[in-house]
Amino acid sequence: MAKQKKHPSGTIAQNKKALHDYFIEQRFEAGVALAGWEVKSLRAGKAQLVDSYVLLKDGEAWLLGSHITPLTTASTHVIADPVRTRKLLLHKRELGKLFGAVQQKGYACVALSMYWKKHLVKCEIALAKGKKDFDKRHTEKERDSDREIQRAMRHGKDD
């Protein structure tokens, strides 16, 4: 059986695809309303945020598309739905900012990561603007050039 990768500083799951597909404008920390079996699964690190996004409806924020795999030892009297819609807990003024920005053209609200803060599960969500293909290529070129510079600096110090 393969070892599970340890995430840094209590991080449960990350959505790296969102960082690739969007320009992140502003970040928010939201609590997540979870069932007991979901918390146990998160402690085991069985969560994915790959295609997850935040739906703003009726003055509330909901996390859609996140997948929490139930443990095999979970109770049998509760039917576990791994992709159920989960409520995000935010302050009213934060919800107001999100609603105002998402109604503007081009803005979306995406989930970036899930992590532990003391004994609570938090979800980092972001107000984001979609990238075009040429923006993605430009970001990739910048990352490659930064990597080359770092490599040159390291080899320069060794001499």
Curated annotation (Swiss-Prot):
Pfam families: SmpB. Gene3D superfamilies: 2.40.280.10. Residues 132-159 are annotated as: Disordered. It comes from the Bacteria. Its main location: cytoplasm. GO terms for cellular component: cytosol. InterPro entries: SmpB, SsrA-bd_prot, SsrA-bd_prot_CS. The keyword RNA-binding applies. GO terms for molecular function: RNA binding. GO terms for biological process: trans-translation. Keywords: Cytoplasm, RNA-binding. It is found in: Cytoplasm. Required for rescue of stalled ribosomes mediated by trans-translation. Binds to transfer-messenger RNA (tmRNA), required for stable association of tmRNA with ribosomes. tmRNA and SmpB together mimic tRNA shape, replacing the anticodon stem-loop with SmpB. tmRNA is encoded by the ssrA gene; the 2 termini fold to resemble tRNA(Ala) and it encodes a 'tag peptide', a short internal open reading frame. During trans-translation Ala-aminoacylated tmRNA acts like a tRNA, entering the A-site of stalled ribosomes, displacing the stalled mRNA. Belongs to the SmpB family. This is SsrA-binding protein. It comes from Pseudomonas aeruginosa (strain ATCC 15692 / DSM 22644 / CIP 104116 / JCM 14847 / LMG 12228 / 1C / PRS 101 / PAO1).
